[in-house]
C-alpha cells in the first residue's frame, strides 16, 4: 500500500503521541542528521545567524524535514562550499502518525467499508511546530548571507504552510546580541565552547572560574 499523503496529517488535531512502551513498532525517522556543514567551527568564525521560522501551527513529516535539509545543504554546498556554514535542524519528529488501512485499490472487487475514524497502526513520524518556532538555523560569515537566505528559501518549498526567513541579531548560535558579545569578548568574560560559549559567572565556585578564565583574573590582578 502506498504512503498516505502528508496533507492528511498537516494539522495538529490530537494530543502528542510519542513512541513508548505502549506505542511500539514505530517506523524509523527518515531524518537522521541534524547538524551538517562545518560543525566544529569556532564561535568567532561564523558571526551571522539566519533562521527559518514557522508561521503556522502544524505538523511537519520526517520525510519533509529530510527533503528540506538535503535541498538547503545541496545549494549552499554547491555555491559556497561545505565549510562555509553550519546548518542545524531545530525540530525533531517525535509524534507518531497512525493509519487505518483499508482496501480501495484496483485489486479489490468492492470498496472496504471499515469503521470510520478508527485508531490505526503506526505509519510514520512528524514534528509538531508552533507559530514562531525555529525549524532550521544556519550560522555563517557575513559575506555568505545571500547564499544562506537563498538556500533556506528553496527549503521552504518542501514544507506545507508558511515560513519566514529571519536574520538573527544574535552572534551565531549564542544567546548574546552582537554588541554584547563583542563587549564580553573584549573583557575576557566569554570562552569558546564549540558552537556555543562559556560565560564567566559572577556567582558560584571561584576556583572553577579561575580555572576556566585564567586570562581574565590575570588581567584583574
From Swiss-Prot:
GO-annotated molecular function: structural constituent of ribosome
Modified residues (Phosphoserine): 143, 205
Keyword Transcription among UniProt keywords: no
Positions of crosslink type Glycyl lysine isopeptide (Lys-Gly) (interchain with G-Cter in ubiquitin): 40, 101
Database matches in InterPro entries: Ribosomal_uL16 (IPR047873), Ribosomal_uL16_CS_euk_arc (IPR018255), Ribosomal_uL16_dom (IPR016180), Ribosomal_uL16_euk_arch (IPR001197), Ribosomal_uL16_sf (IPR036920)
Keywords per UniProt: Cytoplasm, Isopeptide bond, Phosphoprotein, Repeat, Ribonucleoprotein, Ribosomal protein, Ubl conjugation
SUPFAM superfamilies named in the record: Ribosomal protein L16p/L10e
PROSITE patterns, per the entry: RIBOSOMAL_L10E (PS01257)
Sequence-type repeats, residues: 167-181, 200-216
Primary residence: cytoplasm
Subunit structure: Component of the large ribosomal subunit (LSU). Mature yeast ribosomes consist of a small (40S) and a large (60S) subunit. The 40S small subunit contains 1 molecule of ribosomal RNA (18S rRNA) and 33 different proteins (encoded by 57 genes). The large 60S subunit contains 3 rRNA molecules (25S, 5.8S and 5S rRNA) and 46 different proteins (encoded by 81 genes).
Function: Component of the ribosome, a large ribonucleoprotein complex responsible for the synthesis of proteins in the cell. The small ribosomal subunit (SSU) binds messenger RNAs (mRNAs) and translates the encoded message by selecting cognate aminoacyl-transfer RNA (tRNA) molecules. The large subunit (LSU) contains the ribosomal catalytic site termed the peptidyl transferase center (PTC), which catalyzes the formation of peptide bonds, thereby polymerizing the amino acids delivered by tRNAs into a polypeptide chain.
Protein family per UniProt: Belongs to the universal ribosomal protein uL16 family.
Protein name in the entry: Large ribosomal subunit protein uL16
Species lineage: Eukaryota, Fungi, Dikarya, Ascomycota, Saccharomycotina
Amino acid at each position: 500500500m502506498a504512503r498516505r499523503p502528508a496533507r492528511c496529517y498537516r494539522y495538529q488535531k490530537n494530543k502528542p503521541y510519542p513512541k513508548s512502551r505502549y506505542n511500539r513498532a514505530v517506523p524509523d525517522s527518515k531524518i537522521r542528521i541534524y547538524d551538517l556543514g562545518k560543525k566544529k567551527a569556532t564561535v568567532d568564525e561564523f558571526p551571522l545567524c539566519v533562521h527559518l521560522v514557522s508561521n503556522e501551527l502544524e505538523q511537519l513529516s520526517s520525510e519533509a524535514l529530510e527533503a528540506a535539509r538535503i535541498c538547503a545543504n545541496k545549494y549552499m554546498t554547491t555555491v559556497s562550499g561545505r565549510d562555509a556554514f553550519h546548518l542545524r535542524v531545530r525540530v525533531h519528529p517525535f509524534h507518531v502518525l497512525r493509519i487505518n488501512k483499508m482496501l480501495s485499490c484496483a485489486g479489490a472487487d468492492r470498496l472496504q467499508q471499515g469503521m470510520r475514524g478508527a485508531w490505526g497502526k503506526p505509519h510514520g513520524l512528524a514534528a509538531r511546530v508552533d507559530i514562531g518556532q525555529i525549524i532550521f538555523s544556519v550560522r555563517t560569515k557575513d559575506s555568505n548571507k545571500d547564499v544562506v537566505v537563498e538556500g533556506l528559501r528553496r527549503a521552504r518549498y518542501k514544507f506545507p504552510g508558511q515560513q519566514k526567513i529571519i536574520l538573527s541579531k544574535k552572534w551565531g548560535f549564542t544567546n548574546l546580541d552582537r554588541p554584547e558579545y563583542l563587549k564580553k569578548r573584549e573583557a575576557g568574560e566569554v570562552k569558546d565552547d564549540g558552537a556555543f560559549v562559556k560565560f564567566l559567572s559572577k556567582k558560584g565556585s571561584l576556583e572553577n572560574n579561575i580555572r576556566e578564565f585564567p586570562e581574565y583574573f590575570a588581567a584583574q590582578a
